[in-house]
Amino acid sequence: MDTRAFKRSLHHSERYNRRGFGRAEEVAGSLEQAYQSELIQSIRENGYELREGRVTIRLAEAFGFCWGVERAVAIAYETRRHYPTERIWITNEIIHNPSVNAHLVEMNVLFIPVEEGVKDFSGVESGDVVILPAFGATVQEMQLLNERGCHIVDTTCPWVSKVWNSVERHKKNSFTSVIHGKVKHEETLATSSFAGTYLVVLDLEEAQLVCDYILGNGNREAFLKRFAGATSPGFDPDRDLSRIGVANQTTMLKSETEDIGRLFERTLLRRYGPTDLNDHFLAFNTICDATQERQDAMFSLVDEPLDLMVVIGGYNSSNTTHLQEIAVSRGIPSVHIDAPERIGPGNAVEHKPLGQDLERLEPFLPEGDLRIGITSGASTPDRVVEGVIDRLLQLAEAGQIAAEIA
């Protein structure tokens, strides 16, 4: 399928919209009430610090809603205003945040049902309005919705679209796209649908396995077994790893994406020599600015003396998980929570350790003075961060009173 030609055709359709409906002022009040926070703004203006009682809160200098997320949510709100009575669907979570998605449900936006990992579009009819989320949608989904006569509202983040352009360029020049991402993540599924031949690698370890194979140090059967489900149909490692272009899921850890790119460049340089390197490797620059800013701010924050790190965001949010990884790598006690309600009752928190299921930690806050670092993923509203801070301060005050009584 010529994905470039399809996109051009779709973008010229009267039933396609990716710029909103000119109703920004109409929805501004609803967005502010639901997602913004005067407390968080005041903390920003106070050097990202709040002191109250025995607690000092230190906010990362970049956190929370990114521009792409703000844009997607605003367009979704505008869509409901523009189509007040029409049936509106969304192909997936608009962003990875439970409170934001709950607000869409309250606005009577329907989510495409998923049965055993497969989306069921059977209920979508001609004339329905369908929102594509910030992560994008696969080209096959877009084609289905277009052929069905739906009104498509595309909130795909422009940074994601930039990655799609990169893998289409790989395809045009007969390069295999090596995508650094999570194979089942919505963004990676969408990106791979625009690629030709592709291979998804999760981390530097998997990238090293691929590079070992390129240099003749691998077993074909073991390779295909390891990457089953992570390649394009008919992928042949003996044929398809001679010309490589690297791309990434925009929310992956910046430093690891860069390491993977350098690893493939060194490997192909070793395999084919400097004269022919450009015929076998394409450089890349698909790291999202917002992801990079939040990770850089997190690295700065964990350089400070902290007693505890609280990372806030959806449990299925890739960029939030990578922020948690940074704290863990520095040995700072840390918790990843998706909502204020995870804190309490009592001196306890329900949180998600890296790579594990939810667990309850009790006691949560230690006695004495505390410096607590806080950050949030790109899909987390300031209002949620405010709720977490309120709970932490209430818990700290209750603990202080209990200690004084004792």
From Swiss-Prot:
EC code: 1.17.7.4
Leading EC class: oxidoreductase
CDD domains: lytB_ispH
MF terms (GO), sorted A to Z: 4 iron, 4 sulfur cluster binding; 4-hydroxy-3-methylbut-2-enyl diphosphate reductase activity; metal ion binding
Residues that coordinate or bind isopentenyl diphosphate: 96, 185, 317-319, 379
Pathway: Isoprenoid biosynthesis; dimethylallyl diphosphate biosynthesis; dimethylallyl diphosphate from (2E)-4-hydroxy-3-methylbutenyl diphosphate: step 1/1; Isoprenoid biosynthesis; isopentenyl diphosphate biosynthesis via DXP pathway; isopentenyl diphosphate from 1-deoxy-D-xylulose 5-phosphate: step 6/6
InterPro entries hit by this protein: LytB/IspH
Positions annotated to bind (2E)-4-hydroxy-3-methylbut-2-enyl diphosphate: 96, 185, 250, 317-319, 379
Binding site for dimethylallyl diphosphate: 96, 185, 317-319, 379
Ligand binding ([4Fe-4S] cluster): 66, 157, 288
Job description of the protein: Catalyzes the conversion of 1-hydroxy-2-methyl-2-(E)-butenyl 4-diphosphate (HMBPP) into a mixture of isopentenyl diphosphate (IPP) and dimethylallyl diphosphate (DMAPP). Acts in the terminal step of the DOXP/MEP pathway for isoprenoid precursor biosynthesis.
Family from the record: Belongs to the IspH family.
The protein, known as: 4-hydroxy-3-methylbut-2-enyl diphosphate reductase
Organism per entry: Synechococcus sp. (strain RCC307)
Annotated gene: ispH
